[in-house]
Amino acid sequence: MTELKAKGLRAPHVAGSPSSPKVGSPLPCRQATGQFPGSQTSDTLPEVSALPISLDGLLFPRICQAQDPPDEKTQDQQSLSDVEGAYSRVEATRGAGGSSSRPPEKDSGLLDSVLDTLWAPSGPGQSQPSPPACEVTSSWCLFGPELPEDPPAAPATQRVLSPLMSRSGGKAGDSSGMAAAHKVLPRGLSPSRQLLLPTSGSPHWSGAPVKPSPQPAAVEVEEEDGSESEDSAGLLLKGKPRALGGAAAGGGAPAVTPGTAAGGIALVPKEDSRFSAPRVALVEQDAPMAPGRSPLATTVTDFIHVPILPLSHALLAARTRQLLEDESYDGGSGAASAFAPPRSSPSASSTPVPGSDFPDCAYAPDAEPKDDVYPLYGDFQPPALKIKEEEEGAEASTRSPRSYLVAGASPTTFPDFPLGPPPPLPPRAPPSRPGEAAVTAAPASASVSSASSSGSTLECILYKAEGAQPQQGPFAPPPCKAPGAGGCLLPRDSLPSTSASAGATAAGAAPALYPALGLNGLPQLGYQAAVIKEGLPQVYPPYLNYLRPDSETSQSPQYSFESLPQKICLICGDEASGCHYGVLTCGSCKVFFKRAMEGQHNYLCAGRNDCIVDKIRRKNCPACRLRKCCQAGMVLGGRKFKKFNKVRVMRALDAVALPQPVGIPNENQALSQRFTFSPSQDIQLIPPLINLLLSIEPDVIYAGHDNTKPDTSSSLLTSLNQLGERQLLSVVKWSKSLPGFRNLHIDDQITLIQYSWMSLMVFGLGWRSYKHVSGQMLYFAPDLILNEQRMKESSFYSLCLTMWQIPQEFVKLQVSQEEFLCMKVLLLLNTIPLEGLRSQTQFEEMRSSYIRELIKAIGLRQKGVVSSSQRFYQLTKLLDNLHDLVKQLHLYCLNTFIQSRALSVEFPEMMSEVIAAQLPKILAGMVKPLLFHKK
């Protein structure tokens, strides 16, 4: 018979006197020592130690703040009577003899005893017991109640979890209770080590409300029943939680001590100094609670751990590895919420989904993308960053059941819980900026489905709409699909529309969240097109002062050949008819080059070999025109390529026998002798692929920093974040024009950009500092240049010294622009996931081609095999060293992102998404760096 005995030092417990836990109580948990301060325990209730930095809303934005109950005692009293009722019924079940489902064998293990106690079938003489507390022996608790719980915050979050944790109404003996009792456990876990989520249609865990005594008294459970095995009791003494028993089989009163007579009993987890399982005390409450609520589902902190800042590198890596190393997390209970964007960022400003306390950007990782649309709680990578090969309809988002996360080696599937519609939003004020779109609220019925299948911001950039309707101005909003259709109406360039009703769907769609960006014709980015919140800040209009409109892009041949509205001949500037002999040229220059090379004409310039070759004067000097053709990379034996963004282009370029480079005769020599061209003549040529890389280099980007005001830590970091956002957009545009990159799978394209964006930015910073200020300062942008004095005055001086190493290496090695362009592409291809890419073969071919281009770029300056090999070693060693340097930037960026509210630092939307999705993986070692040399 289980007896509840009051805990005291030596004397019996007296009602009304406070009691304290004693050493050797049946339910203690070992205090884990760590770098976090332990919690102090008072005489009556466990007391939570205050966090040094408030993380409420920073890591886990509270969704239902407006629903906080006014009376906190009411919720606590409700939790009280439920445990009392469950306690008494389980005791009645255990004392009933034959009616108990617990096996009487002496050697029964903890597994069978916990299974039988928890999942006893419902019957006329039995009651449904409450589930046991989650107990995890690891020092990193994933979603159990061992995490610190803040008692004052409990009532504020009880109503949030009620749709997920409370069972629906049902009778005690229906078949749903039997189904719940025979659920298959997750593989690799014992019943006492998993989180038991309720299933839809299961009966209530009811408990009869009992009048409490006015004074709380902590009691402990002692095992005295002779039918219980010794190993079960021994495991209990080691901190294993178990179901509690209460009343006798005959329907008598619960057997408790006098101090706890007729009192409700509730489980109160005691805070641990780190992450170990809490002690469980049975504490009387002041008022009864309505039945139907689980005492274990009281606060969000039962399922989420909020780390105490500052975070060390080792702790962050270990914690993230714990969350991400399982290859099939399919739940959204908050595994990645620790890295969710702060409430101050636009990505955290979306409309909350009722019943969920976490933003849509925090999901569990998914090692292998599935065929169906990514569900609301299904993927660690944010839906706004998960790009699908084909756009799917909204019906896929309603598939059921969804997989919810259960701690264990494999996920357990539970049916959907009903989620209420988001609250209606009042109409926004008219736009005050030119071209700003009026944001309208999406229909409530489609909010959830559109949030789960909405298009990505990177997808909007990578896949520009070809058949889009004409815009009202240079910055008019692009059309979007209806919320139910899922994703923006931005199909691939090469993919036809898969929906016959796409035009009709777009006609009735709400406009995009933000006005179009105007970055060379790119559509505007939005976090999730169907999740709209009143007063969502407009992030991008300030960029418009620094970016060129569409009207200017058609005048320059420095963008992707396929995306240009008019293709320009690289020789004379006329309209190009295609790629001829390896270069984009017009038909006239194509025929001229062919006749000049095949006829072996000897042309002589009447001037100084610097004649202007354009559409009007291209026939004036054939010698200068032919020289310009050769310098552009035209080779008579080369293939006639239709498209430059194919890997076969680079393979074919290697087959072209480019002559060995020699110096072009200077002007004095040209005046005294004839300048003869022939197919076998040695001329120094820039390889055509490097020439293309030079043409697609992004324009100068400004930071928008106000240099008239004194520098502060928050203003500098905010300006750098705004600059980083613009550079990230520029990287996406640049990679879209990169030959071979569009051949990779779309998921691989996004992954490579997310893994390498920091490397590309700091590498570009080093190049600008090297070219403009000779490596003496950090040239972030023309309006943000930090000399050594400004570096010392900043709060990240050590980080500036780290970044300063790159331009100093450029000065030391005297890197040429051709070498820089090839190294920049290799940086984009320098980090891949541990499991590899989907287009791994195409990726390796592309990377090998650009390595050969780097060798060609080295050969333009270095003569001889030995010097070229030494140069190649020096440059590739610099690329390898960037991995460790960028890792320091990643750690600083993530810590600043987590503490952005406390530091008053703003993070733009797209940058926030990339940081929250990928930086934890990178810092935890979940990626594979591709090194040229062994360490």
Swiss-Prot record:
Domain of life, per lineage: Eukaryota
Main subcellular location: nucleus
Cross-link Glycyl lysine isopeptide (Lys-Gly) (interchain with G-Cter in ubiquitin), where in sequence: K388
Region Modulating, Pro-Rich, residue ranges: 1-568
Post-translational modification: Phosphorylated on multiple serine sites. Several of these sites are hormone-dependent. Phosphorylation on Ser-294 is highly hormone-dependent and modulates ubiquitination and sumoylation on Lys-388. Phosphorylation on Ser-345 also requires induction by hormone. Basal phosphorylation on Ser-81, Ser-162, Ser-190 and Ser-400 is increased in response to progesterone and can be phosphorylated in vitro by the CDK2-A1 complex. Increased levels of phosphorylation on Ser-400 also in the presence of EGF, heregulin, IGF, PMA and FBS. Sumoylation is hormone-dependent and represses transcriptional activity. Sumoylation on all three sites is enhanced by PIAS3. Desumoylated by SENP1. Sumoylation on Lys-388, the main site of sumoylation, is repressed by ubiquitination on the same site, and modulated by phosphorylation at Ser-294.
Ranges of Acidic residues composition bias in the record: 220-231
Binding site for progesterone: R768
SMART domains xrefs: HOLI, ZnF_C4
Subunit: Interacts with SMARD1 and UNC45A. Interacts with CUEDC2; the interaction promotes ubiquitination, decreases sumoylation, and represses transcriptional activity. Interacts with PIAS3; the interaction promotes sumoylation of PR in a hormone-dependent manner, inhibits DNA-binding, and alters nuclear export. Interacts with SP1; the interaction requires ligand-induced phosphorylation on Ser-345 by ERK1/2-MAPK. Interacts with PRMT2. Interacts with NCOA2 and NCOA1. Interacts with KLF9. Interacts with GTF2B.
Single GO cellular component term: cytoplasm
Gene3D superfamilies hit by this protein: Erythroid Transcription Factor GATA-1, subunit A, Retinoid X Receptor
Chain positions found as Phosphoserine: S20, S81, S130, S162, S190, S213, S294, S345, S400, S678
Region AF3, residue ranges: 1-164
Residue span, NR LBD domain: 681-915
Start-end of NR C4-type zinc fingers: 569-589, 605-629
Compartments it resides in: Nucleus; Cytoplasm
Motif position, Nuclear localization signal: 183-187
Bias kind Polar residues: ranges: 32-44, 191-203
Swiss-Prot/TrEMBL keywords: Cytoplasm, DNA-binding, Isopeptide bond, Lipid-binding, Lipoprotein, Metal-binding, Nucleus, Palmitate, Phosphoprotein, Receptor, Steroid-binding, Transcription, Transcription regulation, Ubl conjugation, Zinc, Zinc-finger
The protein's role, per its UniProt record: The steroid hormones and their receptors are involved in the regulation of eukaryotic gene expression and affect cellular proliferation and differentiation in target tissues. Transcriptional activator of several progesteron-dependent promoters in a variety of cell types. Involved in activation of SRC-dependent MAPK signaling on hormone stimulation.
Position of sequence motif LXXL motif 1: 55-59
Compositional bias segments (type: Low complexity): 335-356, 434-452
Chain intervals for the UniProt region annotation (AF1): 456-548
Annotated protein name in UniProt: Progesterone receptor
Biased composition (Pro residues): 418-433
